[in-house]
Amino acid sequence: MTTYSPKVGEVQRNWYVIDAEDIVLGRLATTAANLLRGKHKPQYAPHIDTGDFVVVVNASKIALTGKKATDSLRYDHSGRPGGLRVTSIGEMLAKNPRRAVERAVWGMMPKNKLSRQQLKKLKVYGGPEHPHAAQNPQPYEITQIAQ
């Protein structure tokens, strides 16, 4: 008997919606990354995109633990002299919460061509509304310890 390998056309894709209100950013990112990669499915294969679509709503109400809002920093450099920009996670959440969540999920994914394709299935919205009602997304609950 040969080992089963999923084919690209056989993959059944589901849509999940995650409410990020009062959810810790790291826990949300790991859950979303696992759903995007398809690791929750028995047909998972690391070389084939078996993942689902993930819609994250209320990204502006996400939680950070400890002093991460001020002490966790992100460094960007333009490549020119004096081109270093330092941004805290709190500033990033205030300015663009969508980008902060996308960046956290990106950090949980492998760095290859397949993950770039899988990240295109992540949709993040700052408020409670999203335009994907036609896809009938299923709510996905993240269980967490009280903060």
Curated annotation (Swiss-Prot):
UniProt superkingdom: Bacteria
The UniProt record lists the keyword Ribonucleoprotein: yes
Record's protein name: Large ribosomal subunit protein uL13
Molecular function terms from GO: mRNA binding; structural constituent of ribosome
SUPFAM superfamilies linked to this entry: Ribosomal protein L13
Chain's role: This protein is one of the early assembly proteins of the 50S ribosomal subunit, although it is not seen to bind rRNA by itself. It is important during the early stages of 50S assembly.
Assembly, per entry: Part of the 50S ribosomal subunit.
Membrane-spanning ranges: none
PANTHER family: LARGE RIBOSOMAL SUBUNIT PROTEIN UL13M (PTHR11545:SF2), RIBOSOMAL PROTEIN L13 (PTHR11545)
Organism: Cutibacterium acnes (strain DSM 16379 / KPA171202) (Propionibacterium acnes)
Species lineage: Bacteria, Bacillati, Actinomycetota, Actinomycetes, Propionibacteriales
Pfam families assigned: Ribosomal_L13
A Gene Ontology cellular-component term: cytosolic large ribosomal subunit
InterPro entries to which the protein is assigned, alphabetical: Ribosomal_uL13 (IPR005822), Ribosomal_uL13_bac-type (IPR005823), Ribosomal_uL13_sf (IPR036899)
Keyword annotations from UniProtKB, A to Z: Ribonucleoprotein, Ribosomal protein
GO biological process: negative regulation of translation; translation
Chain intervals for the UniProt region annotation (Disordered): 126-147
Family in the record: Belongs to the universal ribosomal protein uL13 family.
